[in-house]
C-alpha cells in the first residue's frame, strides 16, 4: 500500500513538472512576481560603492545632484548591506601628494561614521559576516567600511592596522596609478610595469591583511599582481568591482586565467555596471580622445584606449580634471542591464554561481540603463529570473558568496 502511494505521488509530481515545462517560459507578470518574492527572502550586498564628498565632479552624481547610494535608493532597492569605499584616486606620490590623499581618505571615513551616526534607526556598522546578518534581521542596512588605494598610506604599512582599528574590513591596494604597494591595471603617467605586480611592501600587506581578518580586494591590480596576491593569501579574495575581459578587452576586466585563479582560491568576482567594461569602445575612440587631450593641453600619447586617454591627467588642476573626465565619459559606450547580466552569465558558466557577486561602483561613474542606482537593484533579480537562475543561485550572487568569503577570512585570522 505504501509502495502504491509513493508511486502515485511520483507520477503526480512528474505530471505537474511536465505540465509546467510544456507551459513554456514565464510571462513578464510571472517573472516580476517571482523576482519580488525572491528579493523579499534574500540578503542583497553591494560590495563596492563610493563616498561622495562636497566638491566631487558632477559626473559622479545621479541626475539632480543626488547620490546613487543614498538611503532612499538603498531602501527602495532592498539592499541589505553596502560597502562604502574609503577611496582615493590617482595623484602625486610625493610627501605632499600622500598627505593630501590621506586627508581625503580620513574625510571619507568621517563621512561614513557621520552617516551611521545620523541614521541610527536605519543603518549600522558591520565588522563581521554575523554583524551583517544581525543588522539585516533587525530591519537595518549594514554598512561595511572598505578601503581602496594605498597611495594614501605612502609607504606606511602600519596604516593598514590604523584603518582596521577604524573599522575597515575590505582592502584594495590600488586604484588608477601605481603606488608603493603594487602596480595598477590602469597606470597613469608612470611606467606600466614598476613592481612586476606586488612590491615587497605589497607582499607584506597581504600577510598583514590575512592576520587582521580583512578581505583582500584584487580589483584594479595587474594580472601579475592578482596572481601573486592569490598565491600569497591564506584566505579567499574578492574582486569587488570587475567585469569579464573575454567579453570586453579592457585592462580593468579579468582574464579567464584570473577568473580561474579566483575560483581556485575560493574567492568571488563582483560584477560592476560600468559602461566601458561592459561594451567595447568605438573604433574612433582613440582619435576622439586625442582631440579631447589636445583641448586640455595634454601631450599626445602612444597608449591606446582609456589608459592612453587618461595618461598624465594628474597634471591638470581640479576644475580642468573634472571637465576632462566629463568629456572622457561622454566617449564611453552606453551599456544596458542586459549587457551587465551577460557578464554574470559568462562568469557563472566559467567559474560557477558560487564565485559571482554584485559590486556597483556607484558614485564613481558607474550605472547603466536599467541599473543606474541602488533603487534599480530589483531589475537585476528580475533579469536573473528571466534567464532561468534559481533562487539559491540568486541568493549566492546577491550576497551569500560575500558572506562565505567574509567568514572564511575571519576564520583564517583566528587560526593565526
Q: Can you annotate each of these PLM segments?
A:
Residues 1-7:
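Bacterial N-terminal signal peptides that target proteins for export
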Residues 8-17:
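Bacterial N-terminal signal peptides
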Residues 22-195, 249-416:
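N-terminal hydrophobic targeting/anchoring segments and the immediately downstream early-domain regions
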Residues 48-50, 220, 241:
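Histidine-centered divalent metal-coordination motifs
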Residues 156-160, 186, 225-235:
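Distinct, well-ordered alpha-helical segments
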Residues 194-209, 229-237:
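Alpha-helix-loop-beta-strand connector modules within alpha/beta enzyme cores
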Residues 204-218, 224-228, 258-264:
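Substrate-binding cleft of carbohydrate-active enzyme catalytic domains
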Residues 223, 231-266:
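Acidic, glycine-rich loop-and-beta core segments that form the ion-binding/anion-interacting portion
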Amino acid at each position: 500500500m505504501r509502495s502504491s502511494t509513493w508511486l502515485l505521488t511520483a507520477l503526480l509530481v512528474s505530471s505537474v513538472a511536465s505540465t509546467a515545462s510544456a507551459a513554456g517560459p514565464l510571462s513578464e507578470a510571472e517573472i516580476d512576481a517571482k523576482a519580488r518574492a525572491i528579493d523579499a527572502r534574500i540578503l542583497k550586498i553591494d560590495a563596492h560603492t563610493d563616498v561622495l564628498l562636497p566638491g566631487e565632479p558632477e559626473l559622479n552624481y545621479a541626475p539632480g545632484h543626488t547620490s546613487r547610494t543614498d538611503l532612499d535608493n538603498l531602501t527602495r532597492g532592498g539592499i541589505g548591506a553596502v560597502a562604502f569605499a574609503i577611496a582615493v584616486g590617482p595623484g602625486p606620490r610625493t610627501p605632499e601628494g600622500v598627505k593630501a590623499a590621506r586627508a581625503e581618505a580620513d574625510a571619507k571615513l568621517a563621512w561614513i561614521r557621520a552617516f551611521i551616526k545620523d541614521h541610527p534607526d536605519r543603518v549600522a556598522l558591520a565588522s563581521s559576516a554575523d554583524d551583517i546578518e544581525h543588522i539585516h534581521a533587525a530591519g537595518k542596512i549594514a554598512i561595511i567600511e572598505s578601503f581602496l588605494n594605498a597611495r594614501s598610506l605612502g609607504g606606511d604599512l602600519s596604516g593598514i592596522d590604523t584603518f582596521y582599528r577604524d573599522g575597515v574590513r575590505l582592502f584594495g591596494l590600488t586604484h588608477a596609478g601605481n603606488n608603493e604597494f603594487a602596480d595598477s591595471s590602469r597606470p597613469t603617467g608612470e611606467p606600466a610595469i614598476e613592481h612586476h605586480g606586488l612590491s615587497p611592501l605589497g607582499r607584506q600587506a597581504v600577510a598583514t591583511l590575512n592576520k587582521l581578518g580583512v578581505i583582500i580586494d584584487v580589483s584594479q591590480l595587474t594580472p601579475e599582481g592578482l596572481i601573486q596576491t592569490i598565491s600569497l593569501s591564506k584566505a579567499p579574495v574578492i574582486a569587488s568591482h570587475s567585469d569579464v575581459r573575454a567579453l570586453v578587452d579592457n585592462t580593468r576586466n579579468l582574464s579567464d586565467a584570473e577568473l580561474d585563479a579566483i575560483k581556485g582560491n575560493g574567492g568571488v568576482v563582483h560584477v560592476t555596471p560600468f559602461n566601458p567594461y561592459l561594451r567595447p569602445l568605438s573604433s574612433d575612440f582613440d582619435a576622439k580622445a586625442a582631440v579631447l587631450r589636445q583641448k586640455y593641453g595634454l601631450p599626445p600619447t602612444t597608449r591606446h584606449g582609456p589608459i592612453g586617454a587618461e595618461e598624465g591627467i594628474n597634471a591638470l588642476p581640479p576644475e580642468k580634471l573634472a571637465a576632462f573626465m566629463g568629456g572622457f565619459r561622454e566617449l564611453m559606450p552606453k551599456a544596458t542591464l542586459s549587457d551587465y547580466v551577460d557578464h554574470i552569465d559568462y562568469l557563472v558558466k566559467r567559474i560557477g554561481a558560487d564565485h559571482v557577486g554584485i559590486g556597483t561602483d556607484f558614485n564613481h561613474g558607474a550605472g547603466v540603463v536599467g541599473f543606474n542606482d541602488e533603487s534599480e537593484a530589483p531589475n537585476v533579480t528580475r533579469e536573473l529570473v528571466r534567464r532561468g537562475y534559481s533562487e539559491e543561485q540568486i541568493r549566492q550572487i546577491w550576497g551569500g558568496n560575500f558572506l562565505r568569503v567574509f567568514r572564511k577570512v575571519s576564520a583564517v585570522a583566528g587560526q593565526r
